[in-house]
């Protein structure tokens, strides 16, 4: 399975803001972006005027890195969003939010989307009672995501339950049963990622 191999902190520095790719570490003084908030490389501290195309490209790269999606798959999401009813940019973000690895992250299982992706890949979750180990699996409204019986006893999942995350409006959680439910599709107001999706649409519309 293709994946990003570049250091997470370099990705944040390149985009010029924290993408919170390392979870809790991003909130501490150990965060590389807090110490060196400029782009990586020899000329990282020099300021350049970015063209309109450059702004659009950076916005797309930012979204890809936040959700851990590579170019080919991201383009597929865009095509699906463009064909669907509604606003293309918002449709795109909804598709990304409804990925299983992101839903697992939103439910509080994993300090980062990267960790949540690994948990899904390792087979810790069921969707409607069936094991799913594909991070890109798109969940639907009324789907129930549960932690497998075997995984519930591990220290990692006990820690997640003891430190619950505030859930977005489109999800419900039942900590006692190690489960969460998708109660609706997320609205744009529910999606708190620092992405201007309009710029992404402009880029792909050329």
UniProtKB/Swiss-Prot annotation:
Record's keyword terms, sorted: Ribonucleoprotein, Ribosomal protein, RNA-binding, rRNA-binding
Q: Which Pfam families match?
A: Ribosomal_S4 (PF00163), S4 (PF01479)
A Gene Ontology cellular-component term: small ribosomal subunit
One annotated GO molecular function: rRNA binding
Q: Which Gene3D superfamilies match?
A: Ribosomal Protein S4 Delta 41, Chain A, domain 1 (1.10.1050.10), RNA-binding S4 domain (3.10.290.10)
Q: Which GO terms describe its biological process?
A: ribosomal small subunit biogenesis; translation
For this protein, the record's SUPFAM superfamilies field holds: Alpha-L RNA-binding motif (SSF55174)
The record places domain S4 RNA-binding at: 98-164
- Record note on quaternary structure: Part of the 30S ribosomal subunit. Contacts protein S5. The interaction surface between S4 and S5 is involved in control of translational fidelity.
User: What does the record give as the function of this protein?
Assistant: One of the primary rRNA binding proteins, it binds directly to 16S rRNA where it nucleates assembly of the body of the 30S subunit. With S5 and S12 plays an important role in translational accuracy.
The entry's protein name is: Small ribosomal subunit protein uS4
This chain is encoded by the gene named: rpsD
